[in-house]
Regions:
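Sec-dependent bacterial lipoprotein signal peptides
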Residues: 1-17
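A non-transmembrane, solvent-exposed segment enriched in polar/low-complexity residues
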Residues: 17-162
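Stable alpha-helical elements in mature extracytoplasmic
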Residues: 127, 159-163, 203-206, 219
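Sec/Tat-exported extracytoplasmic proteins
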Residues: 128-131, 135-138, 167, 171, ...
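Amphipathic alpha-helical coiled-coil segments
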Residues: 156-171, 190-194
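Charged, long alpha-helical assembly modules
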Residues: 169, 176-239
Length: 239
């Protein structure tokens, strides 16, 4: 009787684990025969490896993971090439990509936010190229310091205005708006939530929306704390 009960309990536990909601990431990577493809979580504390597969000739892959309770960010990686995407209640995300231009020439289906994240990624890539071109011209003494600084300021302003209007304030309750806040240029955050009052407003808009929808999510609390710290830093000193 005890053995039967133990078997029943184990079966029940396994059934419970298997019934937990999952999401599936599937697709193919062309021209990547023999390459390792990694699925990783982009957590607040850093990148966390989740699964991997050695790609065969057709490049097909399929990963399954527990579905997050609130929107979370993940990435596919081949060597140092990365595709970022997000998941909330989505059951399936489909991604097709060539090995050569893995990070930029991919298609993603399953959730509109992941498509928006691709748009933001491509914009950031173009911005980085434009900034690199400016730096190269300045180093070659083709631009004076004043012209270089003015040109850099214009590039950054145009980029931030575009992202603010079309991605952050347009839909602050989305994963793509959150993703936009943390984009980087030369490893520095494009939006400065600790020292720039206008940028703090962007973080505040997303923090409010996230907190309303997912009040107990770790990302909601973290974003709220960033906003509070930024407001304290930029508060006008009392006379």
């Amino acid at each position: 009787m005890k053995k039967v009960t133990l078997v029943a309990l184990v079966a029940l536990a396994l059934s419970s684990c298997n019934s937990d909601p999952k999401f599936n990431v599937k697709g193919d990577v062309s021209g990547a025969d023999g390459k390792m493809l990694y699925l990783e979580a982009s957590g607040l504390e850093g990148i966390v490896p989740l699964d991997s597969i050695k790609l065969k000739g057709d490049g097909s892959f399929s990963f399954k993971q527990l579905r997050p309770e609130s929107p979370e960010f993940y990435r596919l990686r081949v060597e140092d090439k990365v595709i970022n995407f997000s998941v909330d209640s989505t059951e399936t995300v489909s991604i097709q990509a060539p090995y050569t231009d893995f990070s930029t020439d991919y298609t993603v289906e399953g959730w509109d936010n992941s498509a928006k994240i691709k748009e933001l990624t491509l914009k950031q890539v173009r911005l980085q190229k434009d900034v690199d071109a400016l730096v190269k011209a300045a180093q070659a003494h083709q631009l004076g310091n004043d012209v270089f600084e003015d040109s850099l300021a214009v590039l950054l302003k145009n980029y931030k205005d575009d992202v603010k209007i079309n991605y952050i304030f347009a839909a602050p309750n989305t994963a793509s708006a959150y993703f936009a806040l943390f984009q980087k240029l030369n490893n520095y955050m494009i939006f400065d939530p600790l020292n720039n009052k206008d940028d703090i407003k962007c973080f505040g808009a997303v923090a409010t929306s996230l907190n309303n929808t997912y009040p107990h999510a770790v990302r909601s609390k973290n974003l709220y704390n960033i906003v509070i710290k930024g407001m304290k830093n930029t508060r006008t000193p009392q006379q």
